[in-house]
A protein has these predicted regions:
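Charged catalytic carboxylate motif
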Residues: 29-33, 82, 89, 188, ...
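Crotonase-fold acyl-CoA enzyme core
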Residues: 91-204, 236, 241-244
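Glycine- (often His-adjacent) and acidic-residue-rich active-site loop
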Residues: 32, 46, 54-89, 105, ...
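C-terminal alpha-helix plus adjacent terminal tail
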Residues: 1-13, 43, 162-168, 187, ...
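Conserved CoA-thioester-binding segment of acyl-CoA-metabolizing enzymes
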Residues: 1-55, 88
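Structural motif
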Residues: 13-17, 51-53, 72, 98-100, ...
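Terminal peptide-recognition signature
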Residues: 16, 33-34, 52, 64, ...
Length: 259
């Protein structure tokens, strides 16, 4: 798809593959290509799940510091908007998304992984938000998505110290969902997202939107979001198929068309 970001589709699973060696630094071009890849997999009706992968050695080691070093306030005010928008495009993919984390996921790399629904890490993976060591703070969602995932105190520890978090600790605090041997990360991520590939695509999208949008709202608003999504699914073929199959054959045996 792009020079540094490829989209590969196999058996209804799309892989957004970062390829900017040696560390997949997230420069402006990579950011734009990530946004384009997110749009492509969102629009492709044949895609039922997405894996974000940086290769066997590294997920992404953050922003390109050389590119940022001489930036002015005015320049960064504009550039940071592009960065946030590119990651938000990933967070808004209306399908299950799994980040397959090998090696380092630091700074913008971790912030990209936070945009996924689930994170699978290799045993040797290390994640963190080291921007404070540069006299900065996270600028692509780290101060917002991280505390929503692991709580404010743990997020402040990671952001304030800039320390690297190993895979075992990341699993213990809920920062990643599964840890596997380093050589098995990509397949484990595919296996995880593959659980949803034959599911009711419209209902999965509705569930994701209801949860994600509800987290940014008060309870009453969240319940209203849920109610509208729930009611809307009664207009889908999948809901009719699922309920009919339940009555006739019992739970878990429906074959969904994604409509």
């Amino acid at each position: 798809m792009g020079e540094f970001v490829r989209v590969e589709i196999d058996q209804a699973i799309a892989t957004i593959r970062l390829e900017r060696p040696p560390m997949n630094a997230l420069n402006a071009q990579v950011q734009s290509e990530i946004a384009a890849a997110a749009a492509a997999v969102s629009d492709d009706q044949q895609v039922r799940g997405v894996v974000i992968y940086g290769g066997e050695k590294v997920f992404a080691a953050g922003a390109d510091i050389k590119e940022m070093a001489d930036a002015s306030y005015a320049t960064m005010a504009q550039d940071s908007r592009r960065l946030q928008d590119s990651f938000t495009a990933v967070a808004r993919i209306g399908k299950p998304v799994v980040a397959a984390i090998t090696g380092y996921a630091l700074g913008g790399g971790l912030e990209l992984a936070l945009c996924a629904d689930f994170r699978v890490a290799g045993e040797g993976a290390r994640v963190g938000q080291p921007e404070i060591l540069l006299g900065l703070i996270p600028g692509a969602g780290g101060t917002q998505r991280l505390p929503r995932l692991i709580g404010p105190a743990r997020a402040k520890d990671i952001v304030f110290t800039g320390r690297f978090v190993g895979a075992a600790e990341a699993l213990a605090i809920g920062l990643v969902d599964k840890v596997v041997p380093d050589g098995e990360v990509y397949q484990a991520a595919r296996d995880l997202v593959g659980r949803f590939a034959n599911g009711p695509a419209v209902a999965l999208r509705a569930a994701k939107q209801a949860i994600d949008e509800g987290l940014d709202a008060d309870l009453d608003t969240g319940l209203e979001i849920e109610r509208l999504q729930f009611a809307g699914l009664f207009a889908t073929e999948d809901a009719r198929t699922g309920m009919r199959s339940f009555v006739e054959n019992g739970p878990g045996k429906a074959s969904f068309a994604g409509r």
